[in-house]
């Protein structure tokens, strides 16, 4: 094929190529924005930590409603924990209730809370919440078994 007998211009093919390039650019820009927004807002890349934050919210809502047996089941990721309480004899329900009421850092019932942000590490997702407007609570949701665990460090926003 020489320059003098070039193929005819196909407008439909060119429009399709243009639309694919434009759509790919828009998709790429949206992914970059979502990725950075999730990270900067403290919810993980592409908001991947939102399920863990939701779990923490369900747990704290249950504690706020003073349904401690249900909260204990959420804490251990075992809704049927009452059928085998001997598995949890190292941290019994009574101690759990004390830890989330009188012996807690906020010294009483949970009256309000806000799940602030989260960070992912090798073993799970660490979620920070504010209890009763002033006190920080940091729990880790373990990847291995889905249980909640006390996290010894204060989680702060930042890079």
Residue ranges and their predicted role:
Residues 18, 51-56, 74-77, 146-149:
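Short, structured coil/loop segments at alpha-helix boundaries
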Residues 5-61, 65:
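Short, low-complexity N-terminal intrinsically disordered segments enriched in polar/charged residues
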Residues 63, 100, 104, 147-150:
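Hydrophobic, Leu/Ile/Phe/Ala-enriched alpha-helical segments that form helix-helix packing faces
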Residues 2, 12-14, 21, 130-159:
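Short beta-strand edge/turn micro-motifs at domain boundaries
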Residues 26-28, 111, 127, 136, ...:
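Polar low-complexity intrinsically disordered regions enriched in Ser/Thr and small residues
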